Every structure is written in C-alpha cells, then in structure tokens.
Amino acid sequence: MEQYQYTSEYSEMPVIKQDRYFSKIHAKHQAAYGDFGAVNIRDNIVSTFREALIQERNPSVSNNVLLVGKVQSGKTSNLELFTALAFDNGFNLVVIYGGYDSTLLGQTTNRFRKTFDIPSETDYSDSSPVIFSSDDSKQLLSVDNEIFEDLLAANKPVFLISMKRPAAMAKVNDLLQRIDKSKLRAFIIDDEGDQASLNTKKNKATDASATYAEIVRMKKQLGDPLYLSVTATPQAIIFLDEYSELRPDAIRLIEPGKGYCGAESYHLFDSDSIEIISDEDQQELTNGKMPGTLRAAICHYIISSAIMCKRGKNMSDMIIHSHRNVSNHSAIYQCVDAFVQAFKDDIMYNNLDALKTRFEELEKCYIR
C-alpha cells in the first residue's frame, strides 16, 4: 500500500512565529482546559503547522493534509489554534466548510467569532478578524474588491464560513471570483471532510459531483492552498484514487487531551468502565425499586462530581437511560429522586448512622 509521507528536502525548516493571535487563543485554551490540556493542543498544532508549511513548499506533492482526530476529542480547539498560528504567519484568509444546515453553520460561526473576539459589526479601527457567512447572502453579495482591499490594508484576517452545500459554496466561489486574489494567502478547513466532499460520480476521471466540484473550483481560485480535511473516520479519504483532487499527501493525528474517553473506553466488551446490568436489576427499576447497580452508578457520579468540584469544575451531569419507552421514565425518575432526596436529608439532619452507611457505600464504590 502506498504510504503518505514526504521529506523536507526542498526547503529548510520554517521559522514559526507565535504572536498575537496564538497568544490569545492559547490563553483561552489554558482557561478552558488547564495548562496540561492547552500545552497538548499547542505542541500538536505547532508541529502540524510546521509540517504543513514544509509540505506547501514541496512542489512534488499536493497541499492536501488529512487531520484525523477521535470522536469528540477537541478537534475544533486544535483548528482554532492552527488558524491563530496561520494568521500570525502571513495567512490572511481561511475558508471553513461548517456543516450541512443552518444550525451547524451557526454553531461553527459563533464558535470562531467567540474564540477570536470578532465583533458582529466590522470595525476598521482595529485589526480583529472579520467573518462572512454563506448564511447571509446579502452580506456576501455586498462584498467587493474594494472592501477586501480595505480589510487587508487594515491587517484584518478574513473568515469565509460556508455551509457544505453546492449552492452555499457557489456563493463563496462567486465572491472569490469578484476580487483580486493576488494578495491573499489562504487555507481551507473542511470539517468532516469525508462527508459530502468526496466525488460520488461513478466515472471519477471525467465527472464530478456538485459539492466536490465547488471545492475543486475554490482550490483553483485560491491557487491550490493548504487544504485541511478533518475527520474522525478517515477511511474513505485514505483510499481516494489518483483522480481525486482531495487526495491527501500527508496524514496527521490530532492527539486527544489527557483524560479523553472514547469508543475504546466504552465499547469494548472487556472494558473496566462497563458493567453489565442483569435482567433482574432492570426489572426492579421498572417496578420502581432501586437496584444495587443503579445505587453504585449514582455513588460513582457523586464521587466524580466531588473530584470535579475540588478541581474547580462546579457543573456535572448524569444521564440515566434505562428504558426505551418514555412511559417508564416517570417511575425511574421518582425512584432516583427519592434516593437522592433521602441522601440530602441525611446530610441536612446529620443522621450519623445513615451517613455512616452511605459513606461505606461510597468508599466501596471508590476502591472498586
């Protein structure tokens, strides 16, 4: 099987600047994920960005990069820091394909707007980035070459965030066609790059499906920019044939942060995190009785919440999904609520005998 590797023989190791945008986003990651989590993102992305620049300078390979992350492992946080690093190192335009409907597009837009402190109204008196979204057709149509030149003159990086649908992407392509692109240094982020982006036509050498065609058109307009395809399920992209203009020439792993719990933690039969509930316990719960396994689960939740609280995280949630029928949920809720309320009452009224029993139950759960 062909391996996706390249060497840096065409250029010396690039110097990476960690300037204003990098400092801002890294500080936000420190506040959100702690020093360890933020450093994990920083180290991964600085290395990824450096390798991407080396790849960009190598004329024998494409500028397509496949970024593989695990499900819900913080891929977007990594992309935030990659974007910040790009802005600090001469890139002034990022195109993001942000979902397949207005809700997902809005989530992506709001996430980057909040992270980069982008005001809703463009202010030319500072150098904060600006966002244009395919969801606002009137705004996109109003953008012309003069506006883009003013933004670049003010050192304001530009986000173009598009729904991953042909009509929406065509709006962005039409905008790019209207402007002078000679001063642009762009890169593309294709979130969930294995969904909708790939060419679904049978004869891939001559035909192109609609979304794929718009991506290819955009890449050509931007002069073959860095194209980051991001996914947790990379199989379809890895096996793209030579006809695909999205075929990656490098693959990078987005390392999950410390404490990440993914599929391998919960969906393996021999996992220590899984306890099989007996039919008898399920029937007890349906009948409104508290089975021992649910008591143990709640004790585990209480202990975990206490540890989180000690670490400064004051919000936690537990989901109990024990029956497919909604009609059974009320009985289950009453059972759990009675257990929790009794626990609270024992604490409130300092019921020492009951608290001793509960402490022993918690201790047993903790040392399992």
List each language-model region with its residue ranges.
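Conserved pre-motif I regulatory segment
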Residues: 27-68
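Conserved helicase ATPase motor motifs in RecA-like P-loop NTPase domains
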Residues: 68-71, 100, 194-196, 211-242, ...
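Hydrophobic positions on the alpha1 helix immediately C-terminal to the Walker A/P-loop
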Residues: 78, 82
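Conserved Walker A/P-loop ATP-binding site and its immediately adjacent core
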Residues: 92-123, 232, 324-327
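Conserved C-terminal RecA-like helicase domain
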Residues: 109, 118-141, 185-189, 193, ...
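SF2 helicase catalytic motif II
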Residues: 179-216
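Conserved interdomain linker/interface between the two RecA-like ATPase lobes of SF2 helicase motors
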Residues: 248-335
